[in-house]
Amino acid sequence: FGPKGMSYPEEIVVPALARALARPVKWIEDRREHFLTTTQERDQIWDVSIALDVDGKILGLKGRLIHDAGAYVPWGIITPYISTTTIAGPYIVPAFKFDTTAAFTNKPPTTPLRGAGRPQAIFAMERTMDLVADKLGIDRAEIRQRNLIPTEAMPYEMGLIFRDGAPVIYDSGDYPKCQSMALERGEYRDFPRRQAAARAEGRYIGIGIANAVEGTGLGPFEGATIKVAPSGRVVLQTGAAAQGQAHHTTLAQLCGQELNIPIDRIDIVS
């Protein structure tokens, strides 16, 4: 699910045949063929070491990432680059060092999809935090709470460079409050009781904790032009096309707020 950014032969052959035959052409790919020929993304090997002080505060993080690039690399090393600049997550990590190897193998090629390296990095970091909690005898939520970047430290510079060449800077956020709210809504403190009750009924349930920060807003960037038509209606022109995420509604609301006019008098053209 989710491969993108690639052109496959069938995407060219099917419409070409349809035009040549002047009739609909349908191509059906079975699951085995899909697994053998479609790009994938997740295959990485992580070796992570972490240093902490006596209070459970992170002192440093280091390790090695081996990224399976597949038989060839149509998208460069974007995915492992994102992975290594994501693994620190929302935590204060004073010292950081990772070596990354992108290896050619005999597997299908790797391209960015559905997280583009972030899920692997987050999994590696959060499993590390769980192991640390068990080793030190500290609650899993507490060890994370002690290391989350506080809101007063925002904007927070991670000291890393993202794949687009820009520094990794967390512009805002209240990570401690976010985790506290999640734990409260998930009734985390009451979970041992619920787990014991479920076990008595022959059911096995567990609970996990994970924090993540995702880099977004990559360039190039889009602007907007606002014009007032002779009819008095406002026309906002932008290259930000609607994708099912209410872009047009959001733009109309922002425009209406700034111009102090109802959004039904605003036309969005993209």
Task: Give the ranges of each region predicted by the language model.
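Structural alpha/beta core scaffold segments of enzyme domains
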Residues: 1-270
